[in-house]
Amino acid sequence: VERWQSHQLRCPKDLDELLRGFRPLFAYHDHLLEGREIPLATVEEFFKTGAVSQFSGDPKDLMLLQGQRNCYEYLRERVLARDDLETSLVLEVHRILTSGTYTEPFYLVNGERPGDYVTAVNAVGAAARDVGRELDHLVEEVSGYCGSELLQVAAYFHCRFENIHPFAAGNGATGRMLMNYFL
């Protein structure tokens, strides 16, 4: 964490250079954690060019990769400005990451959309009526923390976020993206 914080990032290009190899690796492993397989070379090509060649996989994988790219673009200026974590940022990160991927009928029937809290009764997470309050409390709890236990606080944030499970889908990817943003 200290090494990361020691970098003198003055402009978006500095951050892009620093994270050049990290971004595709993060997206690749994020896909694996979600049970989706896409070759690392394809992910690297997509992050380098914004397109892929020789791809015959699930188009949803490309939508998810595009969400990762768009989310990085959205967060880049906020990382440079060292903006605190806010609930509105959580909602926007989720909206960007999952844009175009809420296609299953039960999401649509329940009126659930990317960037909106869960509305249906789920077997996991906080009750739908409590999600906003619990997420606000979590964000207040960790926002602005800059002490010596940053990694532990980031892990705590991720664990509590997943426990709240604020969205119908995309909680894992959103939580991992926000944990990295927090660090």
Q: Model-predicted segments: where are they?
A:
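FIC/Doc superfamily catalytic core
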Residues: 1-183
